[in-house]
C-alpha cells in the first residue's frame, strides 16, 4: 500500500475510533510511523485528507448501489435499490455517517465529492425515470427520487441507531420493514398526487 492510501486508511481508523474531530495529519503520521511531514506530500491540509476519505466512501456507495442486475420491471429495480441503500447503511456505518452526517470539507477535492454524490444519486434517478416511463430525469422524477432517498435515509437512521430495539415490535416487523416501506413507495408512485 502506498503512503497516500495508508494515510486514508489511518484517517478512517482515527475517525472510527476517536471521532472526526480528532482527525489530524499529525495523528495519521504517528499511526503510520512516518515523519509528521510525510502525509503533507499527498494532502496539503486535514480538509484535503477528509475530502479523499469521503470521496472513497461515495465511490464505494455508488458501486454498491450499482451492484444489482437490472430487470425489465422498474418497480422491482427500485425495491432492490432501496434494499441496497439500507444494506450499505447498516453494513458500512462509518462510511454512511461520513457521507451523510459530515459537513463537506472546503478542499480542492470538493469537485470530486460532488461528482461522486451525483453518481450515486443518478443511479436512483435513472431507475425513477424508468418508473415514470421517461428516458431522462424531469423535475417530477427528481422530486420522487428525493422522496425515496429521504424515506430510505430516515429508515436507515432509525435502524442503524437501534431506535426500534426498545419498542415492542415483533421480529416480523423488523424483517418486513424495508419491503413494507418500498411497497408503500411503489403504491404512492403509482398514484401521484400532482
Language-model-derived ranges and their functions:
Residues 6, 10, 14-48, 52:
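Helix-turn-helix
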Residues 15, 49-57, 99, 116:
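Alpha-helical DNA-contacting segments of helix-turn-helix folds
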Residues 24, 97-100, 107-108, 167-168:
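Short, hydrophobic secondary-structure boundary micro-motifs
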Residues 107-114, 118, 131-182, 192-194:
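Hydrophobic/aromatic-rich alpha-helical bundle segments in the mid-to-C-terminal region
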